[in-house]
């Protein structure tokens, strides 16, 4: 097992905050979105990791953005992430690869391994795939030496730049289905489950807060990561499930989220109220 990295000494050490465990952590994970809505390259990430790297557990390429980038640039990002103990995820691009057949999927996984990716997210927001086939993909990813991270949600057509009206027309699944899927994926060896925000807190008239509540009640928080790339959404998760809930956010939001986790700043409903209790390891 990899030894936990020591948290760097922060400024103003005499001020008490909710201290974070060293990496690798099992709770309070933060995954940041990398290249997609904006250019995120090595030089930008050097600044981000120099200041906030201790709080980032993984970086996710979105929308298959790595397929547009020079291989050298992808490798530089991956290597820089690893230097700062940050894992690298493919994002859910495999569903785009799946429509090209099994050979393309195997080549994709091999290439991800070669480039140094750690996590392959397995999404099916736009396609319909049998659960048993999904389980085979998890097994294939694991046998390649990578971590499988299936994405589960209740919204048909989720995962892209789809309008709220289009998503509403597509309809939603029963949350019981999502819970059953997540349990089967974990039993098959999935590292953690990504919970898609669309249909729950994104592109909806009313937040479906009962869905994450049921998922957490059935599975717990440690094996779930919630998409929350909106300040109101990640503040809601922190308020309701505490500082150690696992969240996916945009790279631009890392400081704002960590201020909430640390209990040093926040909105009126959270200011000074986020508290943790950790046994001393000294």
Predicted features, each with a name:
Residues 2-62, 66-76:
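Conserved N-terminal beta1-alpha1 strand-loop-helix module at the mouth
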Residues 5-22, 214-282:
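C-terminal alpha-helical cap/extension of soluble enzyme domains
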Residues 18-19, 41-43, 67-80, 97-106, ...:
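Active-site-adjacent beta->alpha loops and helix N-cap segments on the catalytic face
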Residues 25-44, 62-67, 89-104, 127, ...:
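Active-site mouth loops of central-metabolism enzymes
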Residues 27-35, 56-61, 88-92, 120-122, ...:
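Hydrophobic faces of well-ordered beta-strands that scaffold small-molecule active sites
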Residues 48-52, 81, 111-112, 141, ...:
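Generic structural signal for hydrophobic
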Residues 186-208:
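Active-site rim beta-loop-alpha module in soluble metabolic enzymes
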